[in-house]
Regions:
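ACP-dependent fatty acid/polyketide chain-elongation machinery
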Residues: 1-87, 92-96, 100-104, 215-217, ...
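Flexible, low-complexity linker/loop segments at domain and module junctions
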Residues: 1-8, 110-116, 138, 235
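Beta-sheet entry/capping signal
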Residues: 3-6, 64, 117-120, 166-167, ...
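Active-site-proximal alpha-helical scaffold in enzymes
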Residues: 6, 14, 93-111, 153, ...
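Fold-independent oxyanion-binding glycine-rich loops
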Residues: 10-11, 69-70, 123-125, 161, ...
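Glycine-/small-residue-rich "gating" segment that lines the acyl/pantetheine channel
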Residues: 36-40, 144, 151-158, 179-186, ...
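A glycine-rich phosphate-binding loop feature that marks nucleotide/adenosyl-phosphate handling sites
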Residues: 41-49, 116-124, 173-175, 200-204
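Active-site-proximal gating segment of KS-fold condensing enzymes and close homologs
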Residues: 55-56, 62-63, 82-90, 113, ...
Length: 236
């Protein structure tokens, strides 16, 4: 059909142990709730710096929705050395895994798209891990740059899969993933690419973002996001 775009595969990770379209659908149909207490080790790197930090961390230690095993990554599967993986923003690791799963969900062998004009369009808005990498001056090395940059989220995926189409990251805050999908659809309709990997990723690895949202009154009182609901009262 002229002027049509087909969604052929999906990959996902969400709080509540959701790691596939099937588990996401089951979660929705059962009315699941992923809100949980803050993991005890979430802000471990910031503990004990000062009394002021400790007080601030108490404000940031609110219930919310948290991904499990953010540090887990099979680097060698993607041809990445364990050392290089240490310097990768977890958002890069997550996109590699989920994009691979999306291709498999579509029945497309990842190796079959190598050398193609497939594009990568990723929305994000959190760069706190990269900031920490760049501020750790004694440990900066060759892998730090690409591991810290948001553009690496898309570019590393293009590199690993050998994709030659457009590859970029955009930040429009909460709408970033939707804008990424919109731009991917435009590129497909314009004939700029024949296949697009599009979506979003958002891992908040620093209490600073949580405190910023708290100060702005943008956090839900009970740690639950309630999109499209009359009781919606903030980010969860």
């Amino acid at each position: 059909m002229a002027g049509a775009v087909a969604l052929v595969g999906i990959g996902c990770r969400f709080p509540g142990g959701i790691d596939s379209p099937a588990s996401f659908w089951e979660f929705l149909t059962e009315g699941g709730v992923a809100t949980a207490p803050m993991p005890a080790d979430r802000w471990a790197a910031y503990q004990g710096i000062s009394e002021e930090f400790t007080a601030a961390l108490r404000l940031a230690g609110r219930p919310g929705n948290f991904l499990g095993d953010v540090d887990g990554f099979d680097a060698e599967f993607f041809g990445i050395s364990p050392r290089e993986a240490q310097f990768m923003d977890p958002q890069q690791r997550l996109v590699l895994e989920v994009a691979w799963e999306a291709l498999e969900h579509a029945g497309i062998a990842p190796a079959s798209v190598a050398g193609s004009d497939a594009g990568v369009y990723i929305g994000t808005c959190s760069d706190d891990y990269g900031r920490r990498l760049l501020e750790d001056l004694p440990r900066i090395e060759a892998w730090t740059g690409i591991g810290a940059q948001l553009t690496g989220i898309a570019n590393r995926l293009s590199h690993v899969l050998d994709l030659h189409g457009p590859s970029f990251v955009l930040d429009s805050a909460c709408s970033a993933s939707l804008v990424a999908v919109h731009l991917a659809c435009q590129a497909l309709l314009a004939g700029e690419t024949s296949l697009a990997l599009a979506g979003g990723v958002n891992i908040i690895g620093s209490p600073a973002y949580t405190l910023t949202l708290h100060a702005a009154g943008a956090l839900s009182a009970d740690g639950r996001s309630k999109p499209f609901d009359a009781e919606a009262d903030g980010y969860g």
